[in-house]
Amino acid sequence: MQKEISQAVIRRMPRYYRYLGELLDAGVERISSNELSVRMKVTASQIRQDLNNFGGFGQQGYGYNVQYLYEEIGKILGLDRQHNIIVVGAGHMGQALANYVKFEKRGFMITGLFDVNPALAGLSVRGIEIHMMDELPEFVKHQRVDIAVLTLPKEKAEQAAEQLVKLGIRAIWNFAHLDLELPDDVVVENVHLSDSLMQLSYNIVRRQDNE
């Protein structure tokens, strides 16, 4: 049985990966946990604890080899393999995500777009045709789907999510304005963009009130 890793640790791993990539681009070959802590705004001890969950990777007196740590964290995050993605909801948000080419650099390949709006049928985004939802079962029969991105309106999202689960899809990146409640064997990441904006608003107001 694999060791259970806390979600707080997992949330920090992509940040480590991004920063290590920046260090590689800058030609940095090694870095200490103290130097990492300044950038990450967590303690050096926390960084060591986080990485020790997966084996450590550092050497006392040397620090971390940036290239090696970058590659190992990439493996931890599953970036050493391809993930096939479909986008369910081909409106503005869905099309924006389909147009984001950097996903492919991380191995996230958008292979299908689906919607419930007949006006979108047959259109394409970056060469990917938009299909209607009733075509989804046939698509899934012939194409491996690892992740579904859900960008439908709230009132249609739950039914679509249930359909995705019935078709055997076990990971959903949910941008609909509700938290999905799905079986335990389905991995769901609920993303509420307005939450981040409200946090920003809070910090603006607090700063203004303190001036």
PLM feature segments, named:
Residues 104-126:
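NAD(P)-binding Rossmann-fold cofactor-contacting core
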